[in-house]
Amino acid sequence: MTTDTHTLHIEEILDLLPHRFPFLLVDRVLDFEEGKFLRAVKNVSFNEPFFQGHFPGKPIFPGVLILEAMAQATGILAFKSRGKLEPGELYYFAGIDEARFKRPVVPGDQMIMEVEFVKERRGLTRFTGVAKVDGEIVCTATMMCARSKPATAVVIKSEVTKSEGTKSEVGKPDVKES
């Protein structure tokens, strides 16, 4: 673990997180220290797909997505602190406590997420998070995340036999070890 602080650009974020458009909610990491804290930014654009329905005529960034953006920031901090995931592993958002929303986030806002490592116990890592716009707090929460072991893949068969024209075991899981 190093004590350097630095930024991460979108290419590095894409290398660390499995999320992609429209669910990647971290545009840039402004600063971090491994095992300590991370500051990231989400530029909120009117073109976000959820603004069509949340809410027509008065677009507001959904609160659950503010929490998801902070959770993605914790994932980046965890990966930079503990190493990247192995094939088959995932980093799950495992819980949230004391979430509070202070004011709406709207198109044109630049949301800064600040997350801090609190502790790790029994495979769960606890973080605190604060989201701000123009220095004003918009959301606070305590989040828990868990790094999974490589999972067993479940493949659903969806074959149709050509000779009989009937479905063979459609929808039945075929479990394979990964």
Swiss-Prot record:
Compartments it resides in: Cytoplasm
EC number: 4.2.1.59
Record: active site: 54
Top-level lineage group: Bacteria
UniProt-listed Gene3D superfamilies: Hotdog Thioesterase
GO MF annotations, alphabetized: (3R)-hydroxyacyl-[acyl-carrier-protein] dehydratase activity
Keywords: Cytoplasm, Lipid A biosynthesis, Lipid biosynthesis, Lipid metabolism, Lyase
GO BP annotations listed: fatty acid biosynthetic process; lipid A biosynthetic process
Residues spanning the signal sequence: none
GO cellular component terms, A-Z: cytoplasm; membrane
Keyword Lipid biosynthesis included in the entry's annotation: yes
Pfam families: FabA
InterPro entries: FabA_FabZ, FabZ, HotDog_dom_sf
Catalytic activity as recorded in UniProt: a (3R)-hydroxyacyl-[ACP] = a (2E)-enoyl-[ACP] + H2O
HAMAP family attached to this UniProt entry: FabZ
NCBIfam families in alphabetical order: fabZ, PRK00006.1
Protein family (similarity comment): Belongs to the thioester dehydratase family. FabZ subfamily.
Function comment: Involved in unsaturated fatty acids biosynthesis. Catalyzes the dehydration of short chain beta-hydroxyacyl-ACPs and long chain saturated and unsaturated beta-hydroxyacyl-ACPs.
Annotated protein name in UniProt: 3-hydroxyacyl-[acyl-carrier-protein] dehydratase FabZ
Gene: fabZ
